[in-house]
C-alpha cells in the first residue's frame, strides 16, 4: 500500500506538470490535530505568484474530489526559494559545486549535521567537502537538506542588472 506522501505525489504531479511547472517537493506535516500540505513548485525561469495561485487552485480542486486527507488541512504552494530544500538524488546532483546544510537520520563519523560543498554524487551517495576533508553520505540517510544561497553573488548580479 502506498504511503500518504506517495499517494499525494501521484495526485499532484500531473496537475503541476499540466500547468508547466515541476513538483520540486511535497511535505505532509501533522502537528496535533493540524495538518499542512506544503507543495514546492519550480520552473525553468522560476515561478511567479500567479503560477503558485494557479497550481493551488487546481490542486485544491483535485484534492476536494479525491479526498486523500482526513479532516481539515492547510494547503501551501510556493517556490522552493533561494535556500531550497533538496529531496532527491537528482536535485542534489543539480547542485554539485554548491554549499548545502544537511541533517542526517543517523550519525556519520559521530555527526548528524554537516555544512559543506557537494563535490560529487556517486552510487546513491553524496560526497561532501568541509573542513579540508571529504565525507561520503548515503542519500537515504539525509533527513533534511537545504541549499545555502550565495548572497554575495546574488547581490552582485542584481547590482549589475541595475547598471544596464
Swiss-Prot record:
GO BP term (any one): translation
InterPro entries named among the record's database cross-references: Ribosome_maturation_RimP, RimP_C, RimP_C_sf, RimP_N, RimP_N_sf
Domain of life: Bacteria
GO cellular component, one term: cytosol
Record keywords: Cytoplasm, Ribosome biogenesis
Principal cellular location given in the protein's record: cytoplasm
Cellular compartments annotated: Cytoplasm
Gene3D superfamilies for the chain: Ribosome maturation factor RimP, C-terminal domain, RimP-like superfamily, N-terminal
The UniProt record lists the keyword Protein biosynthesis: no
Keyword flag Cytoplasm: yes
Database matches in Pfam families: DUF150_C (PF17384), RimP_N (PF02576)
Entry's family note: Belongs to the RimP family.
PANTHER family according to UniProt: RIBOSOME MATURATION FACTOR RIMP
Role noted for this protein: Required for maturation of 30S ribosomal subunits.
Protein name: Ribosome maturation factor RimP
Gene that produces this protein: rimP
